[in-house]
Amino acid sequence: MSNIIKQIEQEQMKQNVPSFRPGDSVEVKVWVVEGSKKRLQAFEGVVIAIRNRGLHSAFTVRKISNGEGVERVFQTHSPVIDSITVKRRGAVRQAKLYYLRERTGKAARIKERLN
């Protein structure tokens, strides 16, 4: 039974997901339905957490919008996601960057990874 589930999950998974880590700045383009119209909406921010669980993988992106912190959790293999673009690589030493929630301005900056 578990082989059937694994096979179905494997078929559902996207193959073109770029590799990114916590601390990286990414732009996620998401399909949004408003009434009868369908359009792309971009959400750009810093990846603060990644959850690797196969088909159920997710990542959290945080940005500051009008002085207010906004976080959004995306399912990595969701059909709603059109594309994920890595804008900048960040050098951090933790897997979860929840400490950025308390920081603002220059204190919330992340060094750029050079390699």
From Swiss-Prot:
Domain of life the protein comes from: Bacteria
Keyword Translocase in record: no
GO biological process: translation
Keywords carried by this UniProt record: Ribonucleoprotein, Ribosomal protein
InterPro entries per the UniProt record, alphabetical: Ribosomal_bL19, Ribosomal_bL19_CS, Ribosomal_bL19_sf, Translation_prot_SH3-like_sf
Gene Ontology molecular function, alphabetical: structural constituent of ribosome
Record's keyword annotation contains Ribonucleoprotein: yes
Recorded GO CC terms: cytosolic large ribosomal subunit
Free-text function comment from the UniProt entry: This protein is located at the 30S-50S ribosomal subunit interface and may play a role in the structure and function of the aminoacyl-tRNA binding site.
Family designation: Belongs to the bacterial ribosomal protein bL19 family.
Family matches, as HAMAP family: Ribosomal_bL19
Protein name: Large ribosomal subunit protein bL19
Organism encoding this protein: Sodalis glossinidius (strain morsitans)
Gene: rplS
